[in-house]
From Swiss-Prot:
The gene is mak5. The modification Phosphoserine is found at residues 85, 566-567. ATP binds at residues 166-173. It comes from Schizosaccharomyces pombe (strain 972 / ATCC 24843) (Fission yeast). Residues 153-331 form the Helicase ATP-binding domain. The Q motif is unique to and characteristic of the DEAD box family of RNA helicases and controls ATP binding and hydrolysis. Belongs to the DEAD box helicase family. DDX24/MAK5 subfamily. This is ATP-dependent RNA helicase mak5. GO terms for biological process: ribosome biogenesis; rRNA processing. Pfam families: DEAD (PF00270), Helicase_C (PF00271).
Length: 648
């Protein structure tokens, strides 16, 4: 008789995805199963799906010859002395070896190998971390704690609830990750979820998972993510295997646990983390977050510890939090953040920890200002990219600006990639992947890229427009100077944006004078003008031609649906078509003018005939290999060095 089985009980096999594909449009995995019959059984007015496994017959005993051959192969393997791995039982103080086949010298070999690849972690010693955690930090290359980690870990180890203000890229994931993983190490045999981390985006959730996997002190600690991109059924199965840490987005987590009554899995959690809390307060997340907080219940029953992190907090709220929330939060303060803090229900009075109290922007970010007319912003942008090449993120306020700036830079042979809300997931991932892999790439984006995306080694952030809010300026600038690196944030401001800049400075508690006026070489700007004018003409004609093409395609599709013959097919000499062909000829002509200019190196400060004459001794620079990549006659200096010199 075939055996009935639930969908979650079937033995699913993971399908290995091809390596040659660049991305999977946000698709995270695929599983398959064989030998299962699907039948439909009437159940009232509906039909119930039944999964049946075929009857399993016992296999006949192997032939004597085959059995002897297998025994011979097994004995040969035994003679070779293949070492078996020891079984390790984790305890709160360290590792206890329980295997009979354990070789004590193998530990020394592993230790030597570990030390040869790890870094010195003596700077972490005063945190009283377990040897396993110190070993993981050493192997991962974290030689010393960052400021937010130094503030959070001691307080979290005692058991305090934490409200942390930390810049993006400041190391806050490890600040809450280390205490959580230490707790999981002490309770590695627990059969329920120990910690829940809630993040606003799928990308951020997977980054947090990667960090946890990187530093987890024991392979027995299981970390799983619940986000879009994986089948709900698979996530439910994984959740039933009792992972220690769950990292999730609010919407998907709510749908997974609510549909199959898995809310009980989270009622005993010991740690709750709300990362990038300001973004979790958006309408798209807040409803599900409120429901999740209601399910978690009263922390007094489970002694649950709570961590809330954000890069920005309202000034008045900060003052009240610094007073340990004296008198609690009342109805007269009704900001979204405070309403959420009321819903969270802390175990005790939370500690407010600010890693950068002096400034909202990370201390390693140097901020520059370029004042220019709106019509000249493209010219100044091209100048910055040519003069200071490096991985650059350009933030604009509108999607139409992204659609114009990206092809403009591409016409100038600058590798540029768009990122905005109207792009589908596949194209977003393609742009991000190309940008990450190009050390001189430019990501032209709206504020969707300001949070939740960890892109290493971003050298410059350029604000093409003054951002609408101070919070967004902080998040944009936080894309650079991540993980103890230095970075540059340059704000381009037009005359009409001056009042907006003043409001921004007021919110950030700084004067406009604190922005360093970024120097611009006007002689190079004049040389680049011709290129920029030609590129503008090409882009304008291309976009105009594209609009005409889209209109024609729409009219044709409408005519086909109505069963009417298209008038375009009858008359090939329509004005639109002749205009389109004229535009194409103009574009080809303009590109032929631009090509030799782009091929030619920019020269400044010296004579082409006499290398030692003029303001720059070019012969000496060539001999000393002090030549700029794009501009002959200029020193190869970074934008960071320029701002550092002007700051002194």
């Amino acid at each position: 008789m075939p055996k009935k089985a639930a969908l979650d009980e079937l033995k699913w096999k993971e399908v290995k995805l091809p390596d040659h594909l660049d991305d999977f449009d946000g698709f995270m995995g695929l599983e398959e199963i064989e030998g299962v019959d699907i039948k439909y059984q009437p159940k009232g007015a509906m039909k119930e799906v039944i999964y049946e496994l075929p009857e399993v017959h016992e296999k006949k005993d192997k032939k004597p010859e085959k059995r002897k051959k297998d025994q011979k192969e097994a004995s040969e393997k035994k003679k070779k002395g293949k070492r078996t791995s020891p079984t390790i039982e984790m305890t709160s103080l360290g590792s206890k070896v329980t295997s009979k086949n354990y070789n004590e010298f193998s530990t020394l070999e592993e230790e030597d190998e570990h030390n040869s690849h790890g870094v010195d972690v003596s700077a972490w010693a005063h945190f009283s971390l377990s040897p396993e955690m110190l070993g993981s930090l050493s192997k991962a290359g974290f030689s010393k704690p960052m400021p937010i980690q130094s503030l959070v870990i001691p307080e979290a180890s005692i058991g305090f609830d934490i409200i942390g203000k930390a810049d993006t890229g400041s190391g806050k994931t490890l600040a809450f990750g280390i205490p959580i993983l230490e707790h999981c190490l002490r309770n590695v045999d627990a059969k329920y979820v120990q910690a829940l981390v809630v993040a606003p985006t799928r990308e951020l959730a997977h980054q947090i998972c990667q960090h946890f996997e990187l530093i987890k002190p024991s392979p027995n600690i299981r970390v799983m993510s619940i986000t879009g991109g994986l089948a709900v059924q698979k996530q439910q199965r994984l959740l039933n295997k009792h992972p220690h840490v769950v990292v999730a987005t609010p919407g998907r987590l709510w749908s997974v646990i609510n549909e199959n009554n898995l809310t009980g899995n989270f009622k005993k959690i010991k740690c709750l983390v709300l990362d990038e809390a300001d973004r979790l307060l958006q309408k798209s997340h807040f409803e599900e977050l409120s429901k999740l907080l209601e399910i978690l219940g009263n922390p007094m029953h489970t002694q649950r510890q709570t961590f809330i992190f954000s890069a920005t907090f309202d000034e008045g709220l900060q003052q009240r939090l610094k007073k340990n929330m004296k008198g609690n939060i009342t109805e007269k303060y009704n900001s979204p953040m405070e309403n959420m803090l009321k819903e969270v229900r802390f175990f005790g009075k939370p500690k407010f920890l600010d890693a950068n109290p002096q400034s909202a922007v990370a201390s390693r970010v140097l901020e520059g200002l370029i004042e220019c007319a709106p019509a000249e912003k493209d010219l100044y942008l091209y100048y910055l990219i040519m003069r200071y090449p490096g991985k650059t993120m350009v933030f604009a306020n509108g999607i139409e600006d992204i659609k114009r700036i990206t092809p403009f830079l591409n016409e100038l042979k600058v590798p540029s990639y768009p990122l905005h809300a109207q792009l589908d997931q596949k194209k977003r991932l393609q742009s991000l992947e190309k940008f990450k892999n190009n050390p001189k790439g430019v990501l032209v984006c709206t504020d969707v890229a300001a949070r939740g995306i960890d892109i290493p080694s971003v050298t410059h952030v350029i604000h093409y427009h003054v951002p609408h809010t101070a919070d967004m300026y902080v998040h944009r600038s936080g894309r650079t100077a991540r993980a103890n690196e230095d970075g540059v944030s340059i704000l381009m401001c037009g005359p009409k944006e001056l009042s907006q800049l003043k409001r921004l400075c007021y919110r950030l508690k700084k004067k406009i004078e604190t922005f360093i006026n970024f120097p611009v070489d006007m002689s190079i700007l004049d040389i680049l003008k011709t290129r920029v004018v030609l590129a503008h003409k090409i882009v304008n004609l291309t976009r105009k031609d594209g609009r005409v093409g889209r209109e024609e395609a729409w009219l044709k599709s409408m005519a086909q649906e109505l069963g009417v013959e298209s008038s375009d097919d009858e008359d090939p000499d329509l004005p639109k078509k002749s205009e389109s062909s004229k535009n194409k000829k103009q574009i080809a002509h303009l590109r032929s003018e631009l090509a030799p200019l782009l091929h030619e190196k920019i020269r400044t400060g010296f004579s082409g005939r006499y290398l030692t004459s003029g303001l720059v001794n070019m012969a000496e620079k060539l001999a000393n290999e002090e030549v700029h990549d794009n501009i002959i006659g200029m020193d190869s200096i970074s934008a960071l060095e320029v701002l550092q010199k002007r700051k002194k």
